[in-house]
């Protein structure tokens, strides 16, 4: 879908893949930033790449959509949007479409390259068995409290992938249901206070670790 088509679909309330349009995306030698801020008077991109200077990367706004192409940022660097509201006050906002977030208590997004990981279910579909005639045993699990190291630190996505897979297989479970894994502020919660719908929580590693 081209830019114009996505813009028209967004305005009709029919853009089902907003994450491809908004947020931060690698574009040539720089990054394209785009955010929906209809009440803003002014918006700019700030981050580690420009010293958090609100004057360094101003965004152009049209019909509530603000965007800018910025040269120089590198994957992994932190960023936010500096937004001046109708009241004239400057507020720093996290990108709601960020694919990777700063580890709590920080709230910035991290620039993330699109992965070359070949998402698909072809292998599963080729090898799947007829399961509906047998029992279904679902293991619902919260990754942060399922198992930890002796010092109380979390296992990483990669460590959880190995240990949890072995555990559910040995226990005879046929399916796994993960409690929320998107970014959230409190370690004490189960993850339902989501602050980033497109970012797997950084508590357990990077987006690449999550894909592992």
Predicted regions and their residues:
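Aromatic-lined carbohydrate-binding/catalytic grooves of carbohydrate-active enzymes
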Residues: 155, 166-211
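The feature marks proteins involved in alpha-glucan
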Residues: 1-32, 60-140, 145-152, 159
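Conserved residues at the C-terminal ends of beta-strands
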Residues: 46, 142-144, 179, 200
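Short proline/glycine-enriched turn/loop motifs at strand-loop junctions of beta-rich domains
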Residues: 36-43
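Short amphipathic alpha-helices and their capping/turn segments at secondary-structure boundaries
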Residues: 126-128, 161-172
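Short beta-strand elements bearing conserved aromatic residues within extracellular beta-rich modules
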Residues: 43-45, 79
């Amino acid at each position: 879908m081209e830019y114009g088509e996505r813009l028209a679909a967004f305005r009709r309330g029919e853009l089902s893949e907003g994450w491809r349009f908004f947020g931060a995306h690698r574009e040539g030698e720089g990054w394209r930033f785009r955010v929906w801020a209809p009440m803003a008077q002014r918006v700019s991109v700030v981050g580690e790449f420009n010293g958090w200077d609100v004057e360094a990367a101003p965004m152009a706004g049209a019909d509530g959509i603000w965007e800018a192409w910025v040269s120089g940022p590198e994957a992994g660097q932190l960023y936010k949007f500096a937004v001046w509201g109708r009241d004239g006050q400057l507020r720093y906002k996290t990108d709601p479409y960020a694919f990777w977030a700063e580890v709590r208590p920080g709230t910035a997004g991290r620039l993330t390259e699109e992965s070359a990981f070949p998402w698909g279910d072809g292998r599963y579909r080729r090898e799947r068995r007829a399961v509906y005639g047998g029992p279904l045993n679902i293991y619902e699990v919260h990754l942060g409290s399922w198992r930890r190291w002796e010092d109380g630190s979390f296992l990483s996505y990669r460590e959880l992938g190995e240990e949890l897979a072995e555990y559910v297989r040995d226990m005879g479970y046929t399916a796994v249901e993960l409690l929320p894994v998107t970014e959230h502020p409190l370690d004490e919660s189960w993850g339902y206070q989501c602050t980033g719908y497109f970012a797997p929580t950084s508590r357990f590693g990077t987006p690449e670790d999550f894909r592992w």
